[in-house]
Amino acid sequence: MTNKILITGASGFIGSFIVEEALNRDMEVWAAVRKTTSRKYLQDKRIHFIELDFGSKEQLKAQLGEHEFDYVVHAAGVTKCLDKADFRRMNTEGTKHFVDALIELKMPLKRFVFLSSLSVFGAIHEQQPYQDISEHDMPRPNTAYGKSKLDAEKYLDGIGNDFPYIILRPTGVYGPREKDYFLMAESIKKHIDFAAGYKRQDITFVYVLDVVQAVFLALDRGMSGRKYFLSDGDVYSSTEFSDLLKKEMGVKWMLRIVAPIWVLRIVTFFGEKLSQITKRPTALNNDKYNILKQRNWRCDIEPACDELGYHPHYKLADGVKLAVEWYKKNGWL
């Protein structure tokens, strides 16, 4: 019997790759979308579409009531908003409404995978030598995004083991179709590389297909209530990503500008004010300031490796090469 899977955030960067892998596994794939959602990466005719309104539990129950899903991957969410309250409304309350609807409908789920983020921990272990952030550490999110994801995690934790959920906490996810790291590529194409802060920064990354690998491992064998960090297993300096972009793009030279943290604070302050005027979300906001200010992004992926059988296949050099090839092929660069 074919397994039926519902994927929220299906039109997004990570979600669209999850859809593709589910199709490769011959699952019956249902992609949760909004009326205004672009379906550019959801062209396969085997995909079923369902419109979901995460703002209302009762509306979700009506929309989901005629369906039975074996698996759910909740990848929907927002990473930047005009109003900080929207993070909670969409990432926290939206998740709560969704889970409550599934429970009240007695959805016969085998597993529910929630895509959270390393950002739920914020700036901890910031004194050198930096230590890996582990599941035993106390989260102290320093961004509105991280707090909204942590609050969603806490809600899931409060439900109990009757709801079979697994939480994945990827570090910075990059790859084809991703737009935020792409901004770095655009800047380097113009021979400019911008960094903030003079203190050593340890950064981690995970290629999008390794996140997808972890999602399906969690669906297959994840223990309810467990949480797993995801990275490629290595730690990088603050310049390695841009150096690899420069190499793969064939840029012969670039000017590396390292600004004090206080300059970044000014830039993001005015970026946020401009966003409020134009009514368009921007990556240059207070959350971005706290993200770039943070020095330690190490995380412990051993539990994911030991319990799920997760083994990252893409080191940063491999992933950047593939991402740049895609950017060029699709006319982004």
Where are these regions (language model features)?
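Amphipathic terminal alpha-helices
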Residues: 299-307, 311-333
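Conserved C-terminal active-site "lid" loop/helix of NAD(P)H-dependent oxidoreductases
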Residues: 208, 243, 267-311
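Active-site Tyr-X1-5-Lys
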Residues: 140-166
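NAD(P)H-binding glycine-rich loop region in Rossmannoid oxidoreductase-like domains
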Residues: 48-93, 97, 118, 122-123
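Substrate-positioning beta->alpha
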Residues: 151, 178-183, 196-219, 225-226
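N-terminal Rossmann NAD(P)H-binding glycine-rich loop of SDR-like oxidoreductase domains
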Residues: 5-25
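Conserved Rossmann-fold NAD(P)-dependent oxidoreductase catalytic core, especially the SDR/UDP-sugar
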Residues: 96-144, 166
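Mid/C-terminal beta-alpha module of Rossmann-like enzyme folds, strongest
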Residues: 218-284, 317, 321-324
